[in-house]
Design a protein with these regions (language model features):
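Acidic, gly/ser/pro-rich intrinsically disordered tails
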Residues: 1-6, 165-187
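Short intrinsically disordered coil segments
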Residues: 54-59, 118-121, 169-180
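OB-fold/S1-family single-stranded nucleic acid-binding modules
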Residues: 145-165
Length: 187
């Protein structure tokens, strides 16, 4: 039997994680459900991932036309609704982390699977933080609420590939205290 391939699912290339809320679900406000979330910063040079995301958004649009139409007489054009692929140079011009990159905000009410480069589960919370580099499996789907409609991005799983400089101006304790000079204080 052939394996079903979801055209609205993407496994990204290596990207940078920002606003990484992957261990504990957080609510945006008191009226919303707590969600796990991450902003995936994708270099514009990763054209393969960008094209896969655009194709998945198109697939989600085609699959979700009934939902997008709602009570209207017609389905809105894809260009007229909210889509999750955003240009960091345009939307975050003052944030160096988003320079020359696109970004996608992905979230889920269920916890994502979190693994390392060897696909082994990561249990130590300090291993995943805003600034780390990794890959993510994400799915795109149509939504239609009272206030807006469009295509959203669901978070499935993340894979840490390598460490990066923490975003947000906070260093990691492991980095602050890992100098050889400090290791000699017991001698």
């Amino acid at each position: 039997m052939a394996k079903y391939i979801n055209p609205a699912k993407v496994v990204t290339g290596v990207c940078r994680f920002s606003y990484a809320n992957l261990w504990e679900a957080k609510a945006m406000d008191e009226n919303s459900k707590p969600k796990y979330s991450v902003s995936l910063i994708i270099p514009k040079s990763d054209t393969k991932t960008i094209e896969k995301i655009r194709a998945a958004i198109q697939a989600a649009y085609e699959e979700g036309q009934g939902k997008l139409k709602g009570n209207s007489k017609s389905v809105p054009a894809l260009t007229s609704i909210k889509t999750p692929l955003r240009d960091g140079d345009l939307e975050r011009p003052d944030d160096e982390a988003y320079a020359n990159s696109y970004f996608v905000n992905a979230n889920s009410i269920t916890a994502p699977g979190i693994v390392d480069a060897a696909c082994q589960p990561i249990l130590e919370h300090s291993e995943i933080y805003s600034g780390v580099y990794g890959r993510a499996s994400i799915t795109f789907y149509a939504f239609n609420t009272k206030t807006s409609r469009g295509i959203a991005c669901g978070l499935q799983n993340v894979q840490k590939i390598w460490d990066g400089e923490p975003l947000g101006g906070h260093s990691r304790a492991e980095d602050d205290f890992a100098t050889a000079e400090d290791e000699d204080f017991l001698n």
